[in-house]
């Protein structure tokens, strides 16, 4: 038993009657920290420790970047989900978990120093079709998960906690408001002033000057049935409307005269699912609405190539591989020229497309497939540009095979380059085509 603002003698009587133990706040219930005050930092640190314990330790450096990305995406990120659903966690908690996730992804350790991240973390946490690795943004995921409480409050008003203030982020409440529309039946479970029930719009948007004259308490409590009964909505208006408000009032009056309540329950629809039912997954995606897409995502992630090869090409597209041009910008040791041709400056675009030995390599692997016409030329703008133009020239049933071949080819070129730079291996790149 956990007494809340209860006299000690009363608590003792109840304890003796129920024959149960007594504890106090803060405590843990069903794995969650709960308190009658704001949670302390120490109450949440245990969750960060749980995440750190899950790191595979000495095995991590032996894993590829793609392997670590899978662990971050499906294991480490999943640990705080239960907490994010129930509690609006502070930003320091998100930053602490992200520090662990980021460090493990790039270096396989719990902590790293600056300069180890090849791609900005905000970009990594985007969905794969928007240019990221599909690792969830914890803050946005928390908003999406907590939106389920707003949905349950709307669709299941008989729950014991219904009517209580739900501590959700303003972004969560704002998205929920514009994403749910209602088909009115008896009007018992639809808010008159704020819900989108009138031809898919809310009165807040249809008549903003009238809405300003409604007290906040009535905005959150007045149902459609109550408002239409004896024109109660008219008496909700406080103060002078002004001439714009008067025009909106008359238009609203005309629209409401056509509303007839039915003897059925109100039906609420979530617009981001075909079924009309809410899901946290669709809510998470909705927070990225309007974002710029990542054009080659299907070519890359839907191919048959191994994950480590696809992750490398993802870095290539973002120009985040440690070639000579990037090493030079940071004042690090670097080869003066391309390790393959020894004529031009090494960039990732030159290495994969315009280098004379690279072009010969692509010709060799494409010729047996009668696709030698697609081999890159010395005038190619970039690796991605050549890939995209070549992909479009193929019939649809050949595109997936071609994408896989390009990704594997790029991986072999990079491995050959590293063997030459770090191991002094001087074998010809053309001979590596047999590895495919």
Show the residue positions of the predicted features.
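A helix-boundary/hinge signal
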Residues: 1-436
């Amino acid at each position: 038993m956990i007494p809340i603002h209860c006299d000690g003698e009363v608590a003792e009587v109840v304890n003796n009657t129920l024959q149960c133990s007594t504890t106090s706040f803060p405590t843990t219930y069903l794995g969650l920290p709960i308190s009658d005050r704001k949670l302390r930092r120490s109450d949440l640190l245990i969750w960060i420790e749980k995440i750190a314990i899950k790191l595979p330790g000495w095995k991590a450096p032996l894993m590829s970047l793609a392997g670590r990305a899978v662990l971050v995406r499906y294991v480490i990120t999943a640990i705080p989900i239960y907490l994010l659903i129930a509690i609006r966690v502070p930003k320091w908690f998100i930053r602490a978990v992200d520090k662990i996730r980021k460090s493990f992804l790039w270096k396989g350790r719990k902590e790293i120093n600056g300069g180890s991240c090849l791609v900005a973390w905000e970009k990594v946490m985007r969905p794969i079709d928007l240019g990221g690795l599909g690792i969830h943004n914890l803050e946005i995921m928390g908003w999406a998960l907590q939106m389920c409480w707003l949905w349950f409050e709307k669709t299941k008003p008989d729950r014991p906690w219904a009517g209580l203030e739900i501590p959700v982020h303003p972004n969560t409440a704002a998205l929920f408001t514009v994403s749910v529309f209602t088909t009115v039946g008896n009007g018992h479970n639809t808010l008159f002033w704020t819900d989108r029930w009138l031809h898919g719009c809310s009165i807040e948007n249809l008549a903003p000057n009238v809405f300003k004259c409604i007290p906040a308490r009535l905005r959150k409590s007045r149902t459609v049935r109550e408002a239409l009964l004896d024109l109660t909505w008219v008496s909700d208006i406080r103060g002078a409307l002004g001439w714009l408000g008067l025009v909106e009032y008359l238009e609203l009056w005309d629209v409401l005269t056509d509303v007839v309540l039915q003897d059925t329950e109100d039906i609420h629809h979530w617009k981001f699912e075909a079924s009309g039912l809410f899901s946290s997954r669709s809510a998470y995606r909705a927070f990225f609405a309007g974002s710029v897409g990542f054009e080659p995502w299907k070519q890359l992630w839907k191919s048959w190539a191994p994950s480590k090869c696809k992750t490398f090409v993802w870095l290539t597209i973002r120009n985040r591989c440690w070639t000579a041009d990037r090493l030079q910008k940071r004042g690090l040791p670097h080869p003066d020229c391309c390790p393959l041709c020894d004529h031009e400056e090494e960039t990732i675009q030159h290495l994969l497309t315009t280098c004379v030995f690279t072009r010969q390599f692509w010709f060799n692997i494409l010729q047996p497939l009668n696709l030698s016409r697609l081999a890159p030329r010395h005038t190619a703008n970039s690796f991605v540009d050549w890939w995209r133009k070549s992909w479009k020239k193929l019939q649809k049933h050949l595109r997936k095979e071609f994408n896989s071949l390009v990704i594997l080819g790029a991986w072999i070129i990079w491995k050959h380059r590293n063997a030459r730079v770090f191991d002094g291996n001087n074998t010809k790149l053309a001979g590596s085509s047999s590895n495919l």
